A protein has these predicted regions:
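Substrate-binding cleft of secreted/luminal carbohydrate-active enzymes
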Residues: 1-86
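Active-site lining segments that contact anionic ligands and/or coordinate catalytic metals
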Residues: 13-15, 48, 107, 121, ...
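Pro/Thr/Ser/Gly-rich low-complexity, intrinsically disordered linker/stalk tracts
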Residues: 68-120, 170-185
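Solvent-exposed loop/turn segments flanking beta-strands in beta-repeat/beta-sandwich domains
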Residues: 115-138
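Short beta-strand segments within Ig-like beta-sandwich modules, predominantly Fibronectin type-III
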Residues: 141-148
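Beta-strand-rich modules
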Residues: 152-174
């Protein structure tokens, strides 16, 4: 896939999302096997590029199992929109005042605040691994993305740690508000 390498090299720091012709898997088209697409997906991931499916009908119709593969094997973790730093480089202010309150049902309500009061302008990402400090670069730690509410119900689970970041409409993410909370403290 030399075209993808060239696109990545010539991107000038901008997002390039190659469109994968999944319609070619249709028997009415070229009847490609699923492995042709999965090979392209892994290659694009290896060189740090995203992708788009063309046409979405073949994705939602699960042609040759592409939807199952994408949800069960390839895209098992949430992902964030890459930041458009060429449009706006500054990150939003990080959230503050992270608190945990035990609910009657035993769950915890995690709440935070942010200087921007309009909840539609600054969505939040919540991370929760078992290690501290929370690694916000690891998508496996994401438990909620682009959340507009400033609270989240979480299980009362020992050994979990939490961090919250703010994002702007350009995908820029703030520094993390980290809390070394565990359910038994």
């Amino acid at each position: 896939y030399p075209f993808a390498i060239d696109w990545a090299e010539q991107s000038h720091g901008r997002i390039i999302a190659p469109g994968l012709g999944i319609y070619f898997m249709s028997p009415k088209e070229k009847d490609w096997p699923l492995t042709d697409i999965t090979r392209q997906l892994f290659f694009l991931r290896d060189i740090g590029m995203g992708h788009a499916y063309f046409r979405s009908k073949f994705f939602t119709d699960n042609t040759k199992g592409i939807y199952d593969f994408a949800t069960d094997e390839y895209g098992t973790y949430p992902s964030l929109i890459p930041p458009m730093t060429w449009a706006k480089a500054a990150s939003p202010q990080k959230p503050y005042n992270l608190t945990f309150t035990t609910q009657k049902d035993g769950t915890m309500r995690m709440t935070w605040q942010h200087q921007v009061k309009d909840t539609t302008m600054i969505p939040f990402n919540v991370y929760s691994p078992t290690s501290y400090p929370v690694d916000t670069k690891d998508a496996r730690n994401l438990v909620a993305i682009r959340r507009q509410a400033r609270s989240l119900l979480i299980p009362s689970e020992k050994g979990r740690h939490y961090a919250v970041t703010a994002t702007d409409r350009y995908g820029n993410e703030s520094l993390a508000l980290q809390e070394a909370y565990t359910a038994d403290t």
